[in-house]
Amino acid sequence: MSFPTLNIGDLIAKTPIVQGGMGVGISLSRLASAVANEGGIGVIAGAMIGMKEPDVASNPLEANLRALRREIEKAREATQGIIGVNIMVALTTFAEMVRTSIEAKADVIFSGAGLPMDLPKIFNETCERKKEEFKTKLVPIISSGRAATLIARKWMASTGYKPLEDKAGRAIPVIAAGGVYTGEDIKKYMDLGASGVQMGTRFVATYECDADDRFKQAYIDAKQEDVTIIKSPVGMPGRALVNNFIDSMRDGGKKPFKCIFHCVKTCEQEKTPYCIAAALINAMKGNLERGFAFCGENVSRVNNIVSVHDLISSLQREFDAIINKPAAATVKA
């Protein structure tokens, strides 16, 4: 049987899988369009997306906006499916990136790394300024019920929308994220009430992933003991693969730098041991001696590179196997 669909407003994803937006440069148009072509929601990561632009150091705002528009356009040329953009609230260019994504007609904006309280306001202002009714869906990334409550109150106040879920007959979709690796995991979360799941790690280990092959190889080589939790220079925790770069920072090392990207609001150059943007750009290019790879908790289970098509097909088979598994018989004594 087919996966159940994931419905976000009038968007219908035939495969209830959202590919995680992975920056810097790990998920761009190539990966996103491949996922969308398989019926899922492909997501372009907005963080430092202009890293390859010639003027990124001298004009980071325009370089990033230009690259974002181009990646959305490239994805559109490669698929008729659903394309989203992940934009972190912590970015100094958050509002500009949101506006550009809306104007470029991204289907969905996913936003976390902070509470995206002003997303509806920016959306409405963009519609008014451009005199156009855009259809971009807005999806906050949250980690608690309290955060959901805060966002719901703020968004209702700023949009005037009322909570009419029962009258509309449409449930608000919840997309579960974290540790989703198999079709069985997808079934588990959907049984708990999720409408879909987000997956990141599995999509790194695909031919279509936009990262360098050496970055992907780090995933294949990873063992469970290689996974650690780090606190990034901008104060956010993350799961990463231990390497010499991370070890040197833990030992009190510091890589002096001049801030040229001005990418994250919370970055204080005088207190920051290294430039997170530079480290992640190096990693994306395969230079892991001068950077590191963020990862998911199941990275040690990755053992080969596959196509996006084969990955989603295998997830479908695993999902079907759980559905078709005979119920255990109960034997009375």
Segments (PLM) and residue ranges:
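Active-site entrance/lid segments in N-terminal catalytic domains of soluble metabolic enzymes
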Residues: M1-P163
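Conserved active-site-proximal phosphate/metal-binding subdomains
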Residues: V18, A148, A157-I175, Y181-A333
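Residue-level detector of alpha-helix initiation sites
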Residues: I26, V180-Y181
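Generic beta-sheet signal
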Residues: A45, N86, I141, A177, ...
